[in-house]
Amino acid sequence: MAARSELLRPAFGEASPSLGRFVINPHSCSYRWWHMFLIMLVLYSAWASPFELSMEKAASIALVVTDLVVDVFFAIDIALSFFVAYRDTSTGLLITDRRKITMRYLKRPCFALDVASTIPLQIIYQLVTGKRQGLWGLLNLLRLWRLRRVSKLFARVEKDIRFNYLWTRLIKLLCVTLFALHFAACIYLWMAFNYKIKELTWIGSQIHSFEDRSVWFCYTCAVYWSITTLATVGYGDLHATNIGEMLFSIAFMLFNMGLTSYIIGNITNLVVRETSNTFKMRDMVQRVSEFGRMNRLPEAMREQMLASVQLRFRTDEQLQQEMLSELPKAVRSGVMKHMFKSAIESCYLFQGVSDSLIVQLVAEMKAEFFPPKANVILENETSTDCYIIISGEVEALTTLADGTEKHVKRIGPRGMAGEIGVMFSIPQPFTIRSRRLTQVVRISHIHLLQAVRPNTADGYIVFSNFIQYLESLKVQTKDVAFVSDHLWNGNSMVLRRATEVAVDESKEAAHKMLPCKEPKRVVIHEQLPNATSTALHPSPGKLVLLPDSMQELMKLSEKKFGKAVRGILTVEGAEVEDIEVIRDGDHLLFS
């Protein structure tokens, strides 16, 4: 029953709290069952206390004996409260010291009210004076202090996901309404039975000698008037006839206004909360439809957009991403590893890699759903992501010279799509389209390279798997122009380097294993001292291949010119800080 936030938690650096002798854990099952038993007694007290007050003859021997038994149980609970550990709100620690527990309970106002609501003051007053009527009968209402336990119960149940929040709130509102009706009806009866002139009461003006009628007849009349007043219908058959009843009716109707507003506001909030996703989906579908009409999109494209939007809401894709993003990174990685590790390990590109690389890859993966006939990747678009098929099926298509699409192959679960463009750093060669409802996980180009670069051995395995896949793809699709062009022509050097590179632990070898474009060629010059104008017309330099890092470039310059190099400048005099900004054919000066 308890929410997770109520579990015991020690302070940072301290061991879990241990309970001392004769100290009760407030979150133990036995103590919670005791609380649930007391809740049943509280419900009885909430009904019996106003009912016994309303009419003297309502307090029968059976009710009096039951009240005494209930008071005994609450007296036992008061005694147990001196042994129940509590949580310090300032530190969040569970206090188990008996002396602190006792002093805290004695100093709190609830101790005095607990005792006052448990002592049978009305019975003692009746035994001493022999009277029950009068204002002393109101002491019986002190037992309503126990209702705070019900409020705490509802607050705890509302946070418990095992219970439906909607029904919990509705039951709470119903209980509040029923208690308000019952309490008002009992007060109306108490005022009528204690007024001197019975004919000048709300019930006496309509029913003569009502005090001789049965208890349940009078109670039914009182509940009837109470509920008509609460519902603001007011048939007029019953009405206030003296000043006291008028004043109480005014107070009761003011209370009814607030209670009605509270109930309407809560129910409205619950209904809106239950239907908010439907409203969002309808609004999004309407906006997508209007967007398609305004921009005169083809009908097939509009249907794809609508299907994607509807699928997104049906699968709660956005909710899943928001939920995962709020989790700590370690927890999120553990969840993603549990969900997608087997799929990645069985994917051809990552077969045989280490578990550490798998963990790095799943940490930033994102799950997505695609409806049937939806384009996952478009041909010739920028290669930013590759996809692993978790369920469903997609097909690879290529566009011929006449504009028609030609089927290349089908890709089922555990297959990959988009990896060719990512590995070669070229536009996507195929259009990838889903054949039915398909779930995929997306790996970004940047994250894939960041995960593979530091892992030299894993990088070798990845690119070896990729080469084998391209070989098999060429055999399967002999008539697809892309495969022959890129496998044997433009990237033949890349493939040879990937297969011939030895597994080296150095950082340079890890970079060489990655597919790269044709090396850049630059001209390096030795900057002449005290010659500002030479920067614009430098002396003839040396044509070299651009290395992979600034450190290698400076070492190469020192080797060529035979002197230490402190920095690298362009011919315009700008200092170069990143090797990536240097273009093919640039002239560089060294200082």
Swiss-Prot record:
Keyword Chloroplast (UniProt): no
CDD domains: CAP_ED (cd00038)
Regions of this protein lying in the Cytoplasmic compartment: 1-32, 85-109, 159-172, 268-591
Molecular-function annotations in GO: voltage-gated potassium channel activity
Domain KHA stretches: 521-591
Intramembrane feature ranges: 221-240
Extracellular side stretches: 54-63, 131-137, 194-220, 241-246
Residues bound to a nucleoside 3',5'-cyclic phosphate: 349-469
Chief location: membrane
PANTHER family: POTASSIUM CHANNEL AKT1, POTASSIUM CHANNEL KAT3
Family: Belongs to the potassium channel family. Plant (TC 1.A.1.4) subfamily.
Name listed for the protein in its UniProt record: Potassium channel KAT4
Organism: Oryza sativa subsp. japonica (Rice)
